[in-house]
Amino acid sequence: MSQGESGYISSCHSIVGAAKKIELAIVDNQSLNGDLSVIGKPLVSVVAFTSKTLNVYDLADAMSAKGWHLNSLQDPPAIHVAVTLPIVAVVDRLIVDLVAVVEEEKEKERVRIVEGKGARGGAKGDSAALYGVAGSLPNKSVMVQLASGFLDTLYKA
């Protein structure tokens, strides 16, 4: 299958446009910009973001539960979206789901505070477990072995 140079250029424009749409949603949407912040200046197809108010690994796990597989980052704790053509077609849905997940996580934080457990309750999801343990290790060289073991376990049938 060939799309030619014009098809390639069109795909690139679509991907960069969708990435920009995600970035602007995080920056401009009042439901997101109080809790999320974009890391750096996304120029092409990857948008990374973090939060000072919510556990980003819980956000990643909640997005995963909605069918999105965003990539967790460790230092700083963050998430990134690698925009591809399939994402372009559903970018508006991704943003709607991200808003919903942020609202759900904010509500969980409110409940934790009301219950006297304090803000930023313990992260409980898969991403939180992996990155929380890796981030707490004083010797970072063991992280490669940890990640390898995690992936082996995750993908064994």
Question: What is each of the regions a protein language model found here?
Answer:
Residues 3, 7-82:
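Conserved small-domain helix->loop->beta segment predominantly found in fold-type I
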Residues 49-157:
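Non-catalytic terminal extensions of PLP-dependent enzymes
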